[in-house]
């Protein structure tokens, strides 16, 4: 018979990564009085800047149920435009033909209780409340004994715990340690540039005339794609900056013939070359997309990205005292905006299945059964979601595929109806 092991104060749960799933899990474990430690490779919460704007919708009930009441009440602190929400504004997420400016699709409006727009940075700041994050702790490896899990860091230190929970993102070091031959993400045939825009209220009017929070579209003439997302608004601050902060992302298909180039168009090397490339694409777009792109400041840093995903196999299974969560389990392309929603519900699925075992100090055999059930639940939900997001990414750069049946435009829901052979 397997010896009974216990989760004691000396052996906390080791959360690797202080992203949304890691911090939300920490908040819940704190409420359950289950010991934990959080390790993050970055230097602090501001290392990565504001990050993406996130739409939280079908995960909102889970988020609110996992947080203590006093933090759930503070969610508006993470809103991209608190004053707009207070006025009752809601996004329709309009989708345009960039070549003509014609509206192709939009979603029904939703109340604040059903859908919110937040920044990743703002949500992380909120979730980090009262959580002791151990910074600059990059994972180097993991190991197991019958009654413990050990996390080893690149500074030479190591920590022993009862369970390792990988919340360390799409390039998860934990996943790499567990699956050295199958940890890599799948690179999609798309390339992306992203830039921050600081806009006056007058400059924002062309965006606000179309939507309060978010614009997106594909050019029917060349399959380039753009989205513009509000990240911050003047009234969010006691001392108004009088500037809106928006994120503009421009992406294109990585294939022969795009934009009359014989070979696939690579990401330009220098910042100036990237700006000129965006300008060239913008000449083919309608307003307001054209002017917004042409007015990118010369000195504004333009970042680059290759969309990637990680689709867990149907029979995917971790082992020993380790489990994956969020992007570490199912990294998604951002074209359906569901990655954060899945990460939040991952935490709920873990709490429902594994926390009772941990709280009652049950042994590894019972814990492993609970973790297997958690993984089954996540794969059933997130595998179709990841594949739908992949298809949405590809469709966003093939105008002829964009219709009401494309995952790019279909309803966002927890259990995606996307079939694997689509």
Where are these regions (language model features)?
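Conserved FAD/dinucleotide-binding core of flavoprotein oxidoreductases
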Residues: 94, 102-119, 194-298
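Conserved Rossmann-like nucleotide-cofactor binding loop
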Residues: 21, 44, 171
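Eukaryotic N-terminal low-complexity, Ser/Thr- and Lys/Arg-rich leader segments
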Residues: 1-12, 31, 148, 208-213, ...
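Short catalytic/ligand-binding loop motif for oxyanion handling, primarily in non-cytosolic enzymes
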Residues: 46-47, 160, 172-176, 202, ...
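Glycine-rich active-site loop/strand segments that organize a redox cofactor
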Residues: 41-45, 49-54, 59-60, 64
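Short aromatic-enriched loop/helix-cap "lid" or pocket-rim segments at secondary-structure transitions
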Residues: 49-52, 148, 204-207, 386-387, ...
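Conserved N-terminal helical subregion
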Residues: 2-13, 56-179, 183-198, 274-275
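Conserved mid-domain beta->alpha element of the FAD-binding
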Residues: 15-39, 165-166, 282, 297-390
